[in-house]
Each structure stands twice: as C-alpha cells, then as structure tokens.
Regions:
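Transmembrane helical elements of multi-pass membrane transporters/channels
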Residues: 28, 57-61, 65, 85-148, ...
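Hydrophobic transmembrane alpha-helices of multi-pass small-molecule transporters
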Residues: 32-36, 62-66, 136-140, 184, ...
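Helix-terminus/linker motif at the lipid-water interface of multi-pass membrane proteins
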Residues: 38-45, 106-133, 137, 155-156, ...
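Short runs within selected transmembrane alpha-helices of multi-pass transporters and secretion channels
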Residues: 1-13, 24-29, 50-65, 143-146, ...
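Hydrophobic alpha-helical transmembrane segments in multi-pass membrane proteins
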Residues: 2-3, 29, 62, 98-110, ...
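Small-residue-rich hydrophobic transmembrane alpha-helices
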Residues: 2-21, 128-185, 189-191, 224-243
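Transmembrane alpha-helix boundary and packing residues in multipass membrane permease domains
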Residues: 10, 37, 54, 67, ...
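Short alpha-helical transmembrane segments in multi-pass integral membrane proteins
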Residues: 1, 42-96, 153-220, 262-286
Length: 286
C-alpha cells in the first residue's frame, strides 16, 4: 500500500496535477493521525488499531489520487510493448540516488546508536531518538521542495530549457535555504521545550543532551537543503551518475567514517558534528 501510494503520487504530480498530489498526501497523513486516535482509544484496539490506521491511510490517499484517472485527465495510457533491459536500467538509474538516501538513513541511525550507547548509555540513545524524529520532519521540507521542482525541470530539456531550469534551481535553493534558516532559528531558541515534548519522565540529563545536540546537529540544515535539491535536480536533468555520487557521499562514504573519527576526538559532541561536517563537504561538490 505504501509503495503503491508513493508511486501514484509521482504519476499524478508529473501528469500535471501537483495540487491533487499534495491533497492526497495531506489528507492521507491527517487520516492516519485521526484513525490512530479513534482505533487506539475509543475503540480500544491498541497496537492492532495503530497498525490498522497506518494501513488504511494510504488507501484513503490512493482513493483521492485515483480521481485524476477516473476524470479522464490522465495523459498516461496502457500500451503493449516489448520488455527492454536498456529502458528499464535507464529508468532505475534515475532513482538510485533516492534509494541510496533512504537505505543509508537506516544504517546511519544504527551506527549512531551504537556509538552513542558506548559514550552516553541509554539516555544518550534516547536523546538521539529525539533528534532523529525531528530530522525526519525537517529533511522532509527540503525533500518536498526538490520533488516539487522535478516535473518542471524534466519538462524543459536541452539548451532551450536551460534558462527555465536555472531559474527554477535558483528559486528552489533560495526557498530551501530560507526555510532551513527559519527551522534552525526555531530549534536554536526552543531546543529545551522541544526536547521536553519527548521527555515524559522529565529526565534533565535527556533534555540537556538532546538540546545541546540539536543546536549542533541541525546546523547541517544549511548544507543538506542544498545537497538534496542538487541531487534531485541532477536526476531530473538526466545526470544520474552525479546524483548517485552525491547521495553516496552523504549516505555512506563520509558520514560513517566522520562519525567514528569525530566521536573518538570529541566524544558525543563529535557525533553531533559529524552530520554538518559531512553535509558541508558534500555541499562543495554540489
């Protein structure tokens, strides 16, 4: 259901209805929240209810997105065609950078957990959990901007489309940087209250570690916003190799060695530093 929903979102967005694509995602996500509450508390279904809500949400989103095809607005048509390995590999190559980004995030979280557990124990791991959850939201902002420009950039190929591509890239980078600045300002000023939202037991050590970590860790937003937009822009302009290299540098080649090295040199502070250092280096290549 998740895969089908994400696939449908991309088809609808690239077929000229980004507003419907956005509506499907927003309503599906809000439905997940509302159904979580309904199934867990009033209906008393517990974890089964949470799982049921999570499975139902993409169905709601897909129902909304399917109206694009039911109204006859779609430009996509099913056709008989012979399987082509070269065509399939060309299509897949454009998605490799996104694949690397998604896979690497889980591996990096695992590595960070082991390093932090050794340095600060369970409290440190819990604090990193706070950062990781907030990072999902903040990174989604840049990802949304990058995915939003993809259909426009892809529809203006060649030399004739270069001025439009350049303009869209500038707008996207400027927007991403401004939102990164706003996000970091909120994090910097409200780090303690934000950490307390995840701290039911009022553990002062957890709040201290998480708030200090946020102020260092999320300086990476200024660089990651550029890197994310750059990777999607490269894929959209049929340059998958460059996009792959950027994603590989961000996902594996730099972040993990940097985490081990900086953790050895600066302890827990070094781990928080490893992400902005990595994103900053990759930004040079972007």
């Amino acid at each position: 259901l998740f895969l089908a929903n994400n696939l449908l979102v991309c088809f609808v967005r690239n077929d000229g209805e980004p507003a419907l694509s956005m509506a499907g995602m927003i309503i599906g996500s809000l439905s997940n929240i509302l159904l979580d509450y309904l199934f867990i508390y009033p209906l008393n279904l517990g974890m089964v209810g949470a799982a049921l809500a999570t499975a139902t949400a993409p169905l709601i989103s897909m129902g909304i997105l399917s109206t694009h095809f039911l109204r006859g607005n779609s430009h996509f048509r099913l056709m008989k065609t012979k399987p082509s390995l070269s065509t399939a590999s060309s299509i897949c190559s454009l998605g490799v950078s996104s694949l690397i980004t998604e896979v690497s995030s889980g591996i990096v979280i695992l590595v960070f957990n082991f390093l932090i557990l050794d340095l600060s124990g369970n409290t440190g791991v819990a604090a990193y959990g706070v950062l990781a959850n907030i990072a999902l939201v903040l990174i989604a902002i840049s990802t949304g901007i990058a995915q939003g420009i993809q259909p426009i950039v892809s529809s203006h190929p060649g030399k004739k489309g270069q001025p439009v591509r350049h303009q869209i890239r500038c707008y996207a980078l400027l927007t991403a940087l401004l939102l990164a600045l706003l996000s970091y300002a909120v994090i910097f000023l409200l780090a303690d209250p934000i950490a307390d939202l995840f701290n039911k037991d009022q553990n002062t050590a957890l709040t201290s570690i998480a708030s200090d970590g946020m102020r260092i860790y999320f300086t990476s937003l200024f660089f990651s916003s550029i890197n994310i937009v750059a990777a999607v822009f490269l894929s959209s302009t049929d340059r998958p190799k460059q996009a792959f290299i950027l994603s590989l540098l961000r996902g594996f080649l730099l972040i993990i060695p940097a985490a081990f090295l900086l953790a050895h040199l600066f302890g827990l502070t070094g781990i928080w530093m490893s992400l902005p250092v990595t994103e900053g280096i990759v930004c040079i290549f972007s």
